[in-house]
Amino acid sequence: MQITISEAAQAHFRRLLDQQEEGTNIRIFVVNPGSPNAECGVSYCPKNAVETTDHEIKYSEFSAFIDEVSFPFLEDAEIDYITEEMGSQLTLKAPNAKMRKVADDAPLIERVEYAIQTQINPQLAGHGGHITLIEITKDGKAILQFGGGCNGCSMVDVTLKDGIEKQLLAMFADELTGVKDVTEHQRGEHSYY
C-alpha cells in the first residue's frame, strides 16, 4: 500500500522535520477509523515512538509510520500542500477512513454501502444530509432512506433520480435496476430546501 504525498507536501514535511530532533519522521493516523466521525491526522514520530507493529512507508527524505489499526483505512489516501493567495494548507484525503475498502467480489450490498458512504454521502453532507441503504430487493432495487437535511427537502426527488440513481446505476450497471426512497419525509427546519 502507498499513501500519495505530493512533492509540495514532502517538502513541507522536510522543512518541519529539519527543526525536530534527528531521526524524527511523521505518523499518519485515523481516530475512530471505520466510523462516520473518523478523522485523519499527521504528527511527528520520534524514533522512540515507533512501535514494532507499525507499518513504515519510505519517502525520499523521511518515513511515514502508520499504526496497525489505521493502516487499512488509509488505503488510497493523498496528502497535498496547497499554497494560495490567502495562505497555505495541508490537505489529507482518505476516502476509506470512514469505511474500509471492500473487495471487488464482495456481496453487492457491501459494495453499494461502500459507494454510498465514500462517494454519495460526502456530497450530501454539504446540505447536512445523508442516505442509508436499507436493503437490495430481489429485482435489484436499492432501497434507501434519507436523513438529516435531505428529509423533507423539496429537491429530494431530483437528488434521488438525477443524482443518486444515475451514479449507482453507472457503478453497478449489471447488478442494480433502480433506487427507491422509503423515507417518511417530514418538512421542518432541518430540511435543506
UniProtKB/Swiss-Prot annotation:
Residue ranges of coiled coil: none
Organism, as annotated: Histophilus somni (strain 2336)
GO BP term, pick one: iron-sulfur cluster assembly
Gene3D superfamilies cross-referenced by the UniProt entry: Fe-S cluster assembly (FSCA), HesB-like domain
Gene: nfuA
Any one Pfam family match given in the protein's UniProt record, by short name: Fe-S_biosyn
Chain positions recorded as [4Fe-4S] cluster binding sites: C150, C153
Function (record text): Involved in iron-sulfur cluster biogenesis. Binds a 4Fe-4S cluster, can transfer this cluster to apoproteins, and thereby intervenes in the maturation of Fe/S proteins. Could also act as a scaffold/chaperone for damaged Fe/S proteins.
Annotated GO MF terms: 4 iron, 4 sulfur cluster binding; iron ion binding
Name the record gives this protein: Fe/S biogenesis protein NfuA
Taxonomic placement: Bacteria, Pseudomonadati, Pseudomonadota, Gammaproteobacteria, Pasteurellales
Subunit structure: Homodimer.
Claim: Iron-sulfur is one of the keywords in the record: yes
Key words of the record: 4Fe-4S, Iron, Iron-sulfur, Metal-binding
Cofactor note: Binds 1 [4Fe-4S] cluster per subunit. The cluster is presumably bound at the interface of two monomers.
Iron in keyword set: yes
Cofactor dependency: [4Fe-4S] cluster
Membership in a protein family: Belongs to the NfuA family.
